[in-house]
Regions:
Chain A
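Conserved ABC ATPase "signature" region
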Residues: 18, 136-168, 216-219
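The feature captures the beta-strand-to-loop junction immediately N-terminal to the Walker
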Residues: 60-62
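Helix-to-loop junction immediately C-terminal to a conserved catalytic motif
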Residues: 75
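Conserved catalytic motifs of ABC-family nucleotide-binding domains
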Residues: 193
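Catalytic Walker B motif of ABC-type/P-loop ATPase nucleotide-binding domains
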Residues: 197-201
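A short, surface-exposed alpha-helical micro-motif characterized by mixed small hydrophobic
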Residues: 238-240
Length: 294, 332
């Protein structure tokens, strides 16, 4: 049962020390010394991080912490200045994104990239891997890809059904609402049957009702044995769905741990609110009252 | 001159040699720009390569063992076309879309100026001579001076050229249709919409963009080959950037990313251009219009066609065959 595997992975995390760079019992993705700087600005400086297989890991941090840059580097959309990282034991340092996707590591984007002038079904079919008909020569001989296409279509319909998009299959993806596009992007990523799904801010711009269904979908993905990593700002969602939380600030990983513990961590609170957030701005404490400025 | 003559002229031009050349180039552009979203502003470079390959190989290098006949020359022309696509594509297709646009528009001019200033390649005089002997030798039409189809009248050579032109177009349309309904075509359309999304789904976009550039370039080169064979003359100043912009006009007029879009566009574009010209000449001839000289008609027809296109863009921005629903979508 894949569900059991997920449960095991999650319970295994309970034994992991809540420290930055902690070793996981069954790491799927391991990154070492990843460094990315833009001129003098160090955007990412991650010494060591491991992502537990079969679990949902959240990557959080204040704006400008380098989460998305780290994400882009790992998924091949940006090049690191230094560092190595591996996926399922294979080194994938600076590997092109399309090769990563073929290895079973697929990502979504913060700004949804639904292919507007393609139908929802075509979006889904584009996700399927290893298609014979995507070779230029084979494409003019339909008998080489018709059977495969039919299978992919059936698989796409099942996924669309699950994501409540089946009725929209023949509509242009551009006619979907923002939330539906998020769903489509997630469903399309699953067409690749990935081992690891990386979601970049899956909740950005999604209404609360749809958020709940997105959360359920993310849990379902894990139950099927797929590992999930996501970047998110929404703390409720992080608390709700993630098994493990990694906190970044100023390019570094400053904390790791179970969601509740991490949110009580003083380093995390300091990173989000500033170390002196609960102190008065002035020594006397009354200069902020009305009238002093006039 | 009467209205019948005006219409006959317009129809014969709309299906004639020039329209076929533009149509072939535009069909290539449809694959590159319409389906894949590649901004090739130098389609004329591919056309020029085709024309000049035939001109140089058949006339300048006449009797050379390297080019025994027209068919081999056509093969070389197509190979040169692939080479040109690689030269243009390798450095630019990994970069943002605008770089290809800059490189292609420059390449078109570079190629024209190199041909114009190199005497071995014809120089400013261009190349004139017999370029399609083998082609005209296999003309299966019976030996007679004129062939009449209703009001249209063709010489024996013209009817052969036009027939072959449209047969080639029909075959290439069939090829385009087969390619674009396949998963390969779906990847191209995906690249047009958002390249990064396609890359994130495990497809090499660089390879597909290169294939589209090469294929579209070959279509343009076939137009160039056809040009040299049909007109038996290659002039450097025919290969100006405006050619590519007329192709874009035809493509957008007919409807981009539609298999038949370029055909509809080319027919209407050439029909209108010639109809307006001949109609104005008719009106000047019979004294209805007195404020124009016949020599002013040439530029004025472009003004009128331009106005017509503006109206089309306002009232039917998706082109004749386009789908308005599709255009209304936020493309990014």
């Amino acid at each position: 049962m894949p569900g059991d595997i997920a449960a095991q992975a999650v319970s295994a995390l309970a034994t992991v020390a809540p420290e930055p760079g902690a070793a996981k019992p069954e790491p799927l993705l391991i990154a070492d010394g990843v460094n990315r700087h833009f001129g003098g600005l160090v955007a990412v400086d991650v010494t060591h991080v491991e992502i537990q297989k079969g679990a949902i890991t959240a990557l959080i941090g204040p704006n400008g912490a380098g989460k998305s840059t780290f994400f882009n580097v790992l998924s091949g959309f940006d090049k690191a200045d230094a560092g190595t990282w591996s996926f399922a034991g294979v080194t994938i340092t600076n590997t092109a994104p399309h090769r990563l996707a073929r290895k079973g590591m697929v990502r979504t984007f913060q700004l949804t990239k639904s292919l507007s002038r393609l139908t929802v079904m075509d979006n889904m079919l584009l996700g399927a891997g290893g298609q014979t008909g995507e070779s230029m020569v084979a494409s003019v001989f339909p008998f080489t890809w018709k059977a495969q296409e039919k299978k992919n279509r059936e698989r796409a319909l099942v996924l669309l059904e699950r994501f409540n998009l089946a009725a929209k299959a023949q509509d242009f993806a551009g006619s979907l609402s923002g939330g539906q596009r998020k769903l489509l992007e997630m469903a399309r990523a699953l067409m690749l049957e990935p081992e690891l799904v990386m979601l970049d801010e899956p909740m950005a711009g999604v209404n609360p009702a749809l958020k709940q269904s997105l959360l359920d979908h993310i849990r379902d993905i894990r139950e099927e044995g797929t590992t999930v990593v996501f970047v998110e700002h929404d703390m409720d969602m992080v608390r709700d769905v993630s098994d493990w939380v990694i906190v970044m600030a100023q390019g570094k990983i400053i904390a790791e741990g179970q969601p509740d513990a991490v949110m009580r961590d003083q380093r995390v609170i300091d990173a989000y609110l500033g170390a002196h957030h609960d102190q008065q701005l002035t020594a006397s404490g009354d200069s902020l009252t009305e009238g002093t400025s006039s | 001159m009467d209205m019948g003559f005006v219409l006959t002229q317009a129809i014969s031009q709309a299906i004639g040699v020039t329209a076929i050349i533009y149509l072939l180039a535009t069909m290539g552009l449809n694959i590159q720009f319409g389906y894949t979203g590649l901004l090739n502003f130098g389609q004329i470079a591919f056309v020029a390569i085709g024309s000049y390959a035939i001109g140089v190989f058949m006339v300048q290098w006449q009797g050379s063992a390297f080019v025994p006949n027209l068919w081999v020359a056509i093969l070389y022309a197509l190979l040169l076309s692939v080479l040109l696509a690689l030269i243009l594509g390798v450095p630019t297709l990994r970069l943002r879309a605008d770089y290809l646009a800059i490189v292609t528009i420059a390449a078109g001019e570079i190629i024209r100026l190199v041909f114009k200033s190199t005497d071995a390649l014809g120089g400013a005089q261009g190349i004139n001579g017999k370029m399609g002997e083998e082609f005209y030798a296999i003309n299966p039409f019976p030996q007679q001076d004129r062939f009449d189809f209703g009001p249209l009248s063709y010489t024996r050579n013209d009817v052969w050229v036009v027939t072959v032109g449209w047969v080639v177009i029909a075959l290439l349309l069939l090829l385009t249709w087969a390619l674009m309904r396949s998963p390969w075509g779906r990847v191209l359309k995906g690249i047009r919409e958002d390249e990064d999304a396609v890359r994130s789904l495990g497809k090499s976009t660089y390879l597909r963009k290169m294939q589209a550039l090469i294929l579209g370039g070959i279509f343009g080169t076939l137009g160039g080959i056809f040009w040299a064979v049909a007109k038996q003359s290659v002039q450097p100043d025919s290969f100006v950037p405006a050619f590519t912009f007329f192709c874009y006009t035809i493509l957008i007029l007919g409807g981009a990313a539609r298999v038949l879009g370029p055909v509809v566009g080319a027919l209407i574009f050439w029909f209108l251009l010639v109809f307006i010209e001949q109609f104005l000449l008719l009106l000047i001839d019979n004294g209805t219009i007195t404020f124009l000289e016949p020599t002013q008609v040439g530029p004025i027809r472009f003004i009128l066609v331009g106005i017509g296109l503006m109206l089309l863009m306002i009232f039917r921005p998706q082109g004749i065959l386009g789908d308005k629903k599709e255009l209304a979508l936020d493309a990014r």
